[in-house]
Amino acid sequence: MTAVSFNNVSIVFGDRPETALAMVDQGKTRDEIGAATGLVLGVANASLTIEEGEILVLMGLSGSGKSTLLRAVNGLAPVVRGDVAVSAATGPVNPYRCNAKALRDLRSHTVSMVFQQFALLPWRTVADNVGFGLELAGMPEAERKLRVGEQLELVNLTKWADRKVNELSGGMQQRVGLARAFATGAPILLMDEPFSALDPLIRTRLQDELLEFQRRLKKTILFVSHDLDEAFRIGNRIAIMESGRIIQCGTPHDIVKNPADQYVADFVQNLNPINMLTAADVMQPGLGQTAAGMSVSATARAATPLIDILDALARQPGSIGIVENGAIVGTISAQDIVAGLTRHRRKQEA
């Protein structure tokens, strides 16, 4: 089921956006539109769906429009054309066409945000920060304390509940931000580069924690990042943006194997694709011989991760037979792996 959808959404900053929209329809670039009109094109004709329980990463360079599109989910960006639909308890809600009460309900109960700059209240305790949204929503104190305690336990900060947030490290403060977002019970989580200000080791640890939380909570997450490794590590799908336009959306595997254009190819050229590829991506098709009748050092299935194939070859050099229904349908040698890992670069150079 679709949790969020963008249908031909355009976002323009400035007065009289219709002049910019006309130039968008003519295929003009953001720079051309800005020079001619003085307006800033945030997003142009974006169409995208995010499914329930999915982590979709908006990826791009600074100024590509990813954070602007993210903010359209809860009505914080000036959408001037197109439709935004957010699945709420009462049905789909367009934050730009609903009444004020429906918009408040959307922001209070359906959508939560986690920011890069943690946006915590330094004069309040950890527990008070986690429960701040619940307090604003009018939740009774006893119920609020119970909910806050559950979220602090989830993010392993129970012992810090009564400390001021400025006593915590950066990574711990971001966990407070996560707990605050989780506490509302909102099914949709907007995360705007939440880990980019942290040290690499802490960032990796929080990525692992987010994936663990996701396995338990099954949120719908729209995640903004300019870190390619982060995007490919946590995203079920990735939408790559340039100058306000969505260039390609697909699984990490799809994007590595088939970049849509030179911009995407440049993005992924320095990525190690080994974590996205499987045996099927690099094998040499072979005849349907039985595994017993063909000389191979080991066998594996087509869906076996390539990293596991490498481990097998390290233990038993030779060729790995790829088996389907008891017959070998292909083989993989060390050279096949090298070719598979560099294929996306060769495509780019061509």
Residue ranges of model-derived segments:
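Helix-to-loop junction immediately C-terminal to a conserved catalytic motif
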Residues: 74
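Conserved ABC ATPase "signature" region
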Residues: 23-32, 87-94, 131, 135-138, ...
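ABC ATPase "signature
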Residues: 249-250, 258, 331
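The conserved cystathionine-beta-synthase
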Residues: 289-318, 322-327, 332-350
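Conserved ABC ATPase signature
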Residues: 164-168, 172-174
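ABC ATPase NBD coupling module
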Residues: 33-40, 92-112, 258-259
